[in-house]
Amino acid sequence: MSTVTFFNPYLCGPRKPRAPSAGEGGAEGAAAARARAASAPFLQIVPRGCLYDGERGLLKHNCALAPRMFFRDRPYVLSKDLVWPTLPPPAVPASTTERAPRAPAPSADLLFHMYDQAETVVSADSKELIHPGYRHRITPCGVVLRLFGRTADGASLCVNVFGQDAYFYCRYGDAQSLHDRLYRLSDTLELAPVFHVRVRRVQRCSIYGYGTRPFADLYLVACGNWHVLKKMGQCLLDEGVEVFEVGVSPLTRFLLDKKIPSFGWCRLRRWHARPAHGRLSTAELEVDCEVADVRGVDDVAWPLYRCLSFDIECLSGGGAFPVAENLDDVVIQISCVCYPVGGTEEQRAAFPVAERHLFTLGPCAPIPGVLVYEFPSEFELLCGFFTFFGRYAPEFVTGYNINNFDWRYLLTRAERVYRWPVAEYTRLRFGGRFCAYVPGGGGRQPGFRTAQTKVLITGTVVLDLYPVCMAKVSAPDYKLNTVCELYLGRQKEDLSYKELPRAFLSGDAGRARVGRYCVQDAVLVKELFEKLNYHYEAAAVARLARISLRKVIFEGQQIRIYTCLLEEAAARQMVVPTFRSGAQRGAATGAGGGGGEETTYQGATVFEPTVGYHHAPVAVFDFASLYPSIIMAHNLCYSTWLRDDPGTPARPPETPARPPETPAAGPSGAAHAGGVPGATFRTPFRTPAGVPAAAAGGVGAGPPGGGAVSSASVGGRAAVSPSETPAEREPEPAPEDVFVVHVGQGVSYRFVRENVRASILSELLRRWLAQRRAVREAMRECEDETRRLLLDKEQLALKVTCNAFYGFTGFSQGMLPCLPVAASITTIGRDMLSRTSAYIEAHFAEPAFLARFFEPGDLPRADEPPPTVRVIYGDTDSVFVRFGGVRAGAIVARGEDLAAAVTEALFTEPVKLEFEKLFVALMMICKKRYIGRVFGSDALVMKGVDLVRKTACRFVKTVVRDVVELVFRDAAVAEAATRMSELTLEEMRRVGVPAGFHVLLQRLARARDDLFSGRVETAALVLSSVLSQDVSRYKQLNLPHLAVIRRLAARSEELPSVGDRVSYVLTAGPPDGRANAPNYELAEDPDYVAAHRVPIHAAKYFEQVVKAVTNTLYPVFPRGVVRRDRFLADLVPKRVYLGDEFKRHARPVEEEVCESERGGSGLLSSLDSSR
């Protein structure tokens, strides 16, 4: 019998089994025989079309042979020992069963770049081959941090860091009572008995509120079992005990306490290399070290990392959109694009891996430039892809919507359909995580997450470009095709999911066509990845905030500021309080009593604008980094806020005081007394024989400046004191050292000035803004493009993080809300804007002031009206100033000097007013809506108009843009618009429509003709709305985009995900339908409309055109007109449009010219209805 007992009957016709050649990757040698013997039977599912061209359906049968693939007509057994035929051979054995020479003893420091981390809890009975010198760190259990990266010479690396404890802080009466309480919690929570708790007294004060000295009853609670510690801290919090920094992971403690960059270079002083047969990871080098042996290195350069872009194609057994849980909805192809990221140009040019790969079911015709791997069944296809993934071992994985679809689909098929674990394909041979999940049940929480689905792969960073593009670009929809057109300037060759099955089942050539489409998507994502460079931006944020790269990607803004506060608080011997979720609102309000009423605060100021079409120059001045500058200028912070209830601890008012508790006796029955250190190390396990007590209860890595081991009681105090004594509080500062902010409604907040206590927020902002200035200066001097890009992303990360401080304090459901700080910031901002406006109107028009900044030729002559200066609008951090009679070029030349004069007169550093731009013409529509032409540019700046709104269709935007261009470019139209805005309706009745305005009316008439004549393509009529939550959670169901989703579901088509923009078109509806049917009855999927030639509702679209133009030209219409849209519609010449059934009987006639087109007033007789 031949050694090859199986070949794929679906790839080729009958053929003779070929004996494998020696050394071939697919040879059935000893490793392959072991794999076949050990492999369990699996279900083979393959489309019938792979065997019989054009046939539908699936073939299913159980197979007892080892899974395999075919590459270039050679079979390869998919085993753990497989050397992938197109990848460089691994530097270390693929399996721990093959031993490699032991690594030499380290003779120097080990320099490496870290990109990812994982934290695990390892017990003393672990099967890991751990160096004896680190065994005491995991007795009975301990945290081991896995740091993944690459060495300076490019070798992949896994560093196992021992000795980092997780800990939190807690106020309690004495250490023994606290320890006994924690011991009892272990039984209450049914926690695993393998843990060890250590308690010691420390000297810290709270960051929340000024005035408290270090607590006399504050204890640090540390434990080697991070999961146990987190639950115990939460239980204490729920029981009313005042706790601090609960939930801070040991990885975060490591990064903060040791000042380690979460994405950057590190150095190991001492380390021990693991032999190949004892490695837990698949890295080329694996070492063990103590937490104290790791040092950070200040360098932003990247080594060469591997990146993978992929895309999948699926085939539904029932013809509907594929659902992973359905057995018959199989994965048919997976494309992979491998490419380098980081490193030098020479390193990227020498990247040893081929770029394009395709994994396909069944035989496939060759595709130029693509390596094609063929598989007999879906299970083997998945096995091949994950094997390739493990062998290639990318540090970064990207794609488009891979979190919500591709990864979830692949993992569901592998784990639920085939019961096949995939965690072994991570960077850890066991104990790794390879999963996709939706935190918190799938609902979005603003400020916390930037993506709905999280994908966690140990040792690999997943960067989905779909949420990145949604955050960075404004588009009508976020399909890959649309985004590629915006960023790359080209579209992809599209293949709908309805065409795809026919092409795939048609034969080898059809599968090659599908393969080209699949590879094309992965290539486009690769180009988007390199265009956006979001990985550099995210890495810069990770370094700044000392959080992992995956937290930057998935966790939003709150965690970034929180970790920065943790680090700064620790440097000042402060602790950050933890609030119960129900008490977050109370923390945010800052209320002094126990009242349950919610306190709110007023937001930023928006001045009522002077609506109109302004021909005079309008200068825009704005404050540089308004909210950060307010924090720095006025020393605002949690730590400088003077609470009005000095006798109350710094906790939310809704958090109850800790219940009194007397010192409890230990389990042995003897009450603890005295200062015996061993008494605080009471554990629910027996010390193993031969292990010293100190080793079993090692202190590990504690926080900086740790305190002494506590005694059983503190000065004879009760176990819990409900508030600080007067001796524990700072003396009340002098009145001149207090800054008071009156926020309105009789509410005031007080903050101490910088000479009393420097604000933590101010210190962070000053440091980061100074760092940003230094980085931008380095950018100007940098000639290396790669380094310049890295520096640019670093300064952007600094800017974004600085601007996030206000939102961090003002979000009531955030991690550390504080209404006194947030309300004070907005109050001061409103006052600054008002004072700026008053100063400008009081001084800018004075002759002496103008003479300081302008030449006589820039101002009106003596026989002309004097110059006028008036503030016509103000919004949050900017003011719009209209200059009458001043030359525009002179205002631009002296704009910065004018802004500096205001800053010098009104404000102190670092507050700074800046000159932003000058409009030579501005149409102020209403608050937050305007259009203007900037001096020295032909471009129009628009805000809030339908032209820039995502909900408007392209056709409406085109018409509005044409109208705006006419108003700003055509002198006759501009003059007519100005004239019309000065008239009343009665005056217009007498004189008629200004002649130049008819050009605009003709454009609207042409738009109406295009709609009713069917000359507008469907793509230009697409409207869209965001699916903000699951359909079942909407209370109002008669919305157009929800109606479209229901229609898609009824046709078993692809459904959008939460957060997607749902596109739709308004159709004409049934012939016997209502004339004014609501939009949700007419909404339909654009692809369906285009495919079935469904007529559109021309009247509704023209109504949208008229309303959009009316909203844009709001200031132009005569005074006294109430229904402006109706007024404009009546001005457009009337026409009658015949239906198709009448057109064959119609005779062409000369089109009549309406009276209004000749400048007469005959049309105005019908305008009474618009009043």
From Swiss-Prot:
Biased composition (Basic and acidic residues): 1149-1158
Region of interest (Disordered), ranges: 647-687, 704-735, 1149-1171
Major site of localization recorded for this protein: host cell
Enzyme class per UniProt: transferase
Keyword Transferase: yes
Bias-annotated ranges (Pro residues): 649-662
SUPFAM superfamilies assigned to the protein according to its UniProt record, in alphabetical order: DNA/RNA polymerases, Ribonuclease H-like
MF terms (GO), sorted A to Z: DNA binding; DNA-directed DNA polymerase activity; nucleotide binding
PROSITE patterns listed in its UniProt record: DNA_POLYMERASE_B (PS00116)
Assigned keywords, A-Z: DNA replication, DNA-binding, DNA-directed DNA polymerase, Host nucleus, Nucleotidyltransferase, Transferase, Viral DNA replication
Subcellular location: Host nucleus
Catalytic reaction(s) noted: DNA(n) + a 2'-deoxyribonucleoside 5'-triphosphate = DNA(n+1) + diphosphate
Composition-biased stretches (Low complexity): 663-674, 709-725
Enzyme Commission number: 2.7.7.7
GO CC, any one term: host cell nucleus
Homology family: Belongs to the DNA polymerase type-B family.
Record-given protein name: DNA polymerase catalytic subunit
Species, as recorded: Tupaiid herpesvirus 1 (strain 1) (TuHV-1)
